[in-house]
Amino acid sequence: MTLQHKLTQFPRLDLVGNATPLEKLSRLSDYLGREIYIKRDDVTPVALGGNKLRKLEFLAADALRQGADTLVTAGAIQSNHVRQTAAVAAKLGLHCVALLENPIGTEQANYLTNGNRLLLDLFNVDVVMCEALNDPNQQLAELATRVEAQGFRPYVVPIGGSNALGALGYVQCSLEIAAQAAGNVAFSSVVVASGSAGTHAGLAVGLQQLLPDAELIGVTVSRSADEQRPKVAQIQQALATSLGMTDPLAKITLWDSYFAPQYGMPNEEGIAAIKLLARLEGILLDPVYTGKAMAGLLDGIEQQKFCDKGPILFIHTGGAPALFAYHPQV
């Protein structure tokens, strides 16, 4: 049974539509002396784009199957995931409740009210603030219980949409990448931001089957490689099991030198990467995820960390709305 056929066994809403572009970054390639390509998941069609829409195709389909009328999720005040979940809820006529934290403890007005947070108000989200998401699964379960007591039928969407069901979205994306690359380019490496781990795990499972010669590198955005690896591995294993795969799982490669000082806080290397891509290619990265992932790619080339010198694919997971929240730092 093909990977495509296995995916059809899971209910899925068509939210992404056509395949997102896969393009060569010609000016960046000339600048670096290395072929760099980009998968433009920043231009998925709902609410200013981003990778979470692929996960929500499966998660929202499951919510509707279960008869839910409310999506309950959590994240940072500037969460791209919460923004996209809220937009999908609005599109489907569902209520949305979001549990938010301020992970960087800032009082800057732009962070508290602009960017993704502004969009939550437009989508009519019921926002609940908490001190910290120390145990998000338990906190979401408790919030769902309260929502249910109010007469709603909640469906919990995990942080980042990252569980085995949501990660199917990036198995699906792997099929897109393989089809777009076929006969055109043979990638030696694929670089992606690794945070809640679902995108990374989905690509790990999909690309292992479809582009086995490409090394997948996750650039961590919130924790060390030792802390991140079990998170990726847990979803990777659950995903492979759900798809009936019995082959040994692909090795998890993580680079963790680019997320400091912490999740959600910009750093010089990430901001430099944002400015470089904007000025060379007219493409916007963000200071939380893709800026740091691109910083990893740039440093990886400079430090000769890639396994060979073939073309590199960068997965652009979106996040540009957060730029407005981080002014004037960016």
Curated annotation (Swiss-Prot):
Described by its record, this protein's role is as follows:
Catalyzes the alpha,beta-elimination reaction of D-cysteine and of several D-cysteine derivatives. It could be a defense mechanism against D-cysteine.
Ordered alphabetically, the record's keywords are:
Lyase, Pyridoxal phosphate
Q: Which Pfam families match?
A: PALP
Is Chloroplast set as a keyword in this record? no
Required cofactor names: pyridoxal 5'-phosphate
The record ties this protein, via CDD domains, to: ACCD
The PTM N6-(pyridoxal phosphate)lysine maps to 52
Q: Per the record, what are the reactions this protein catalyses?
A: D-cysteine + H2O = hydrogen sulfide + pyruvate + NH4(+) + H(+)
Transmembrane stretches, start-end: none
A single GO molecular-function term is:
D-cysteine desulfhydrase activity
Q: Which family does it belong to?
A: Belongs to the ACC deaminase/D-cysteine desulfhydrase family.
Annotated EC: 4.4.1.15
Q: What class of enzyme is it?
A: lyase
InterPro entries per UniProt: ACCD_DCysDesulf (IPR027278), D-Cys_desShydrase (IPR005966), D_Cys_desulphydr_bac (IPR023702), TrpB-like_PALP (IPR001926), TrpB-like_PALP_sf (IPR036052)
Tell me the Gene Ontology biological-process terms attached to this UniProt entry: D-amino acid metabolic process
Question: What subunit structure does UniProt give?
Answer: Homodimer.
The identity of this protein, by name, is D-cysteine desulfhydrase
Entry-linked Gene3D superfamilies = 3.40.50.1100
Q: Does the keyword Lyase apply?
A: yes
Source superkingdom: Bacteria
